[in-house]
């Protein structure tokens, strides 16, 4: 019976070649599009899901009111980082980071460009990226430390234990490896192969030191971890006027959480 069905199908295909090609092509395109849409939806819904507390973490943004328009920025003044810690009882922690970028990482005669971040010591506690070596709560405590990815550790150290070894960054800073984290998934907002303590940046970059208490320079990223039962709108209400209180210009600028 199956053989007869196949023979009949083949005869119909030969008899109506053009019609069959159109139908088969349409079906193939439809299936391909459905698979692509399914993969896209799967990627979108799984984005940042590797971060255990993703629903509790919010980035601080600014709405700036100019005449008849509102501009939204995800860059904020540096003192936002410290001021947020006591701004509301439901704010568990705050984190400040740079914007990332490639730097030259060197070990002896090995030199490689890798992307990474300057990040405050709370970063790994808040985002909870899995650690292979080191305690996430302390690996960024020392300003002269560096935490690297599993991949970067393998590239530079092969099978050797990198713990306590030193790396040269941009031919200017010598930093000690204090931890190794698992490679970051592709569907993560953060993509990096190393973390350098924020205090190292403060110590080595004059312009960062100059902006520690400056509310007029919007050059930094700040993230907040909220308590599990926190009402985001309630927290926003308590912090939205901070810029107007601290700033010195007449432009209305309001904090909100994204």
What are these regions (language model features)?
Residues 1-11, 15-19, 51-52, 236-258:
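Membrane-helix entry/capping segments
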Residues 9, 24, 28, 40, ...:
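Structural preference for long, well-ordered alpha-helical segments in enzyme cores
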Residues 13-16, 23, 44, 60, ...:
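Generic structural signal for small/hydrophobic residues in well-ordered secondary structure
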Residues 16-43:
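Short, strongly hydrophobic transmembrane alpha-helices
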Residues 37-102, 210-211, 215-227, 234-238, ...:
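Membrane-proximal extracellular/periplasmic loop immediately following the first transmembrane helix
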Residues 55-57, 89, 111, 141-145, ...:
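Extracytoplasmic
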Residues 62-73, 96-122, 132-146, 170-172, ...:
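Short acidic/polar micro-motifs at solvent-exposed secondary-structure junctions
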Residues 120-133, 146-258:
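Mid-to-C-terminal secondary-structure elements
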């Amino acid at each position: 019976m199956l053989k007869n069905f196949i023979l009949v199908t083949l005869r119909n295909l030969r008899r109506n070649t053009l019609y069959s090609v159109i139908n088969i092509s349409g079906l193939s395109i439809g299936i391909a599009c459905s698979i692509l849409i399914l993969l896209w939806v799967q990627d979108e819904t799984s984005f940042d899901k590797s971060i255990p507390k993703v629903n509790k973490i919010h980035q601080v943004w600014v709405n700036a009111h100019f005449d008849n328009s509102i501009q939204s920025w995800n860059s904020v003044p540096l003192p936002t980082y410290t001021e947020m810690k006591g701004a509301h009882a439901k704010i568990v922690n705050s984190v400040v980071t740079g914007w990332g970028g490639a730097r030259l990482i060197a070990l002896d005669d090995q030199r490689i460009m890798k992307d990474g971040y300057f990040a405050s010591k709370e970063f790994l506690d808040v985002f909870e990226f899995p650690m292979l070596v080191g305690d996430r709560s302390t690996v960024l405590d020392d300003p002269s430390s560096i935490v690297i990815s599993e991949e970067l550790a393998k590239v530079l150290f092969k099978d050797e234990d990198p713990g306590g070894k030193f790396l040269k960054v941009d031919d200017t800073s010598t930093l000690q490896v204090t931890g190794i984290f698992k490679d970051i998934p592709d569907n993560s907002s953060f993509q990096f192969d190393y973390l350098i303590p924020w205090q190292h940046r403060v110590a080595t970059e004059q312009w960062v030191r100059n902006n520690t208490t400056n509310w007029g320079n919007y050059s930094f990223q700040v993230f907040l971890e909220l308590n599990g039962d926190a009402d985001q709108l309630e927290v926003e209400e308590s912090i939205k006027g901070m810029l107007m209180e601290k700033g010195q210009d007449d432009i209305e600028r309001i904090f909100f959480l994204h």
